[in-house]
């Protein structure tokens, strides 16, 4: 059982739902292949809403990045009609996500696109290991805190620091991507000291066997 924020001890059941690598699949139709598509956010929201009816605020909805590219709807929103709210932000806001990380394919769209998207997204955009090189401060919010049914939850977000190996610097100018393990240790100490959470969730946009292993970086770090 969790020790709740109240003085009594009780069993609290939480439901944590996480999406990742949506790649613009918002609607149940593949606009590239021109045929119906399984999955997609249109179906995810039906599932999430059914769980919200059961769990209420004991449900935490998280996204792990790579949402800005993939379908023509994203390209249109990102580059053809950027004056309107970004469709990825609109979907995240409509589905009432609690927190989100940024992925390497989001960075690939360039500053003008992802900076606007970040501003338009209502939930915290997390990235503890992304640093503004001009100010030497976090470019994104490192972590978010949620209190659900007396349980204090910390969500720490990070993304792969291999971005400079894949993307031209013009896409991420002014940013530095720190190694994940040392960054996690640094922020975990801060979270434990300042927040004293009951649970810590790692929301890391990083994979297994990514093909890059150096003294400074290991793609399997999140594991």
What residue spans do the PLM features occupy?
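Acidic, metal/ion-coordinating pockets
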Residues: 2-223
